[in-house]
Amino acid sequence: MIRIGTRGSLLATTQAGTIRDALIAAGHDAELVIISTEGDRRADEPIADIGVGVFTAALREAIADNVVDAAVHSYKDLPTAVDPRFMIAATPVREDARDALVARDGMVLGELPAGSVIGTSSPRRVAQLKALGLGLEIRPLRGNLDTRLNRVSSGELDAIVVAKAGLSRIGRLEVVTETLEPVQMLPAPAQGALAIECRAGDTALAQLLAELDDADTRAAVTAERTLLAELEAGCSAPVGAIAEVVESIDEDGRVFEELSLRGCVATLDGSDVIRASGIGSPDRARELGLSVAAELFDLGARDLLDERGRDT
């Protein structure tokens, strides 16, 4: 029996349930084990105030203590610093990485009147929303997805911004009033992706889990998280990134794959947003992440990050 650790929220158990079901379909016995995390217990506090790994540390300790054999993480929640006790055995096919607006009366972002109250606690979303100059009032937003959605339907908030992937996984895409394109709002690095983690020495389990790995997703996430790690910005910093494997045609008419990466660093008040992009080979995803991070530094990203205090 493969014991899969997961947080207890509907979204987390749904995500982990897809992994359990895939393993069972492949002929392996698997079950979910619910693990309570610091982020769940302190649901009313800003994530940045709780610390690094608020949703992942307890899951990792459960792996280390042999309470579970593996854990399913929202990849964007994992610290970028490598922990030698563990390995990412698989990165399954990614859901839509983009952010989604859920607004009253079916409105899109540009239709919200100045002064509208929009909920999000992500510094990345706050910074990019402010940079759009729409005159929105932004308020902190924590809690599970249903709780957040209820704050719009109850009239407490005019709109919220959340990850589209989460709404997709719990079957609530009908509430989305606008999918925010990366030109409006770059997603968090690894948003929409899952990481299946196990003990570093558990090679038999790692090989089994690797059947669920998607090479394009792994390449994209590697580029995005390398950029984040190089910036030493932490998962709650105002940093956005999205990478995609795309098809190109060479001068001889042959189709080949490239990896594109876009990244941004912003001030918390949205007064300055620095953007950079690059293209490379999917099998050199890390190098692409380093290259785009270097370009961001050349454009002044270090000063923007130093303003808020750097957090690894």
UniProtKB/Swiss-Prot annotation:
One of its GO terms (biological process) is protoporphyrinogen IX biosynthetic process. It catalyses: 4 porphobilinogen + H2O = hydroxymethylbilane + 4 NH4(+). Binds 1 dipyrromethane group covalently. The modification S-(dipyrrolylmethanemethyl)cysteine is found at residue 235. GO terms for molecular function: hydroxymethylbilane synthase activity. It is an enzyme of class 2 (transferase). InterPro entries: HemC, Porphobilin_deaminase_cofac_BS, Porphobilin_deaminase_N, Porphobilinogen_deaminase_C, Porphobilinogen_deaminase_C_sf. Keywords: Porphyrin biosynthesis, Transferase. Its EC number is 2.5.1.61. The keyword Transit peptide does not apply. The keyword Metal-binding does not apply. GO terms for cellular component: cytoplasm. Pfam families: Porphobil_deam, Porphobil_deamC. Its cofactor is dipyrromethane. Pathway: Porphyrin-containing compound metabolism; protoporphyrin-IX biosynthesis; coproporphyrinogen-III from 5-aminolevulinate: step 2/4. PROSITE patterns: PORPHOBILINOGEN_DEAM. Monomer. Belongs to the HMBS family. The porphobilinogen subunits are added to the dipyrromethane group. Tetrapolymerization of the monopyrrole PBG into the hydroxymethylbilane pre-uroporphyrinogen in several discrete steps. This is Porphobilinogen deaminase. The gene is hemC.
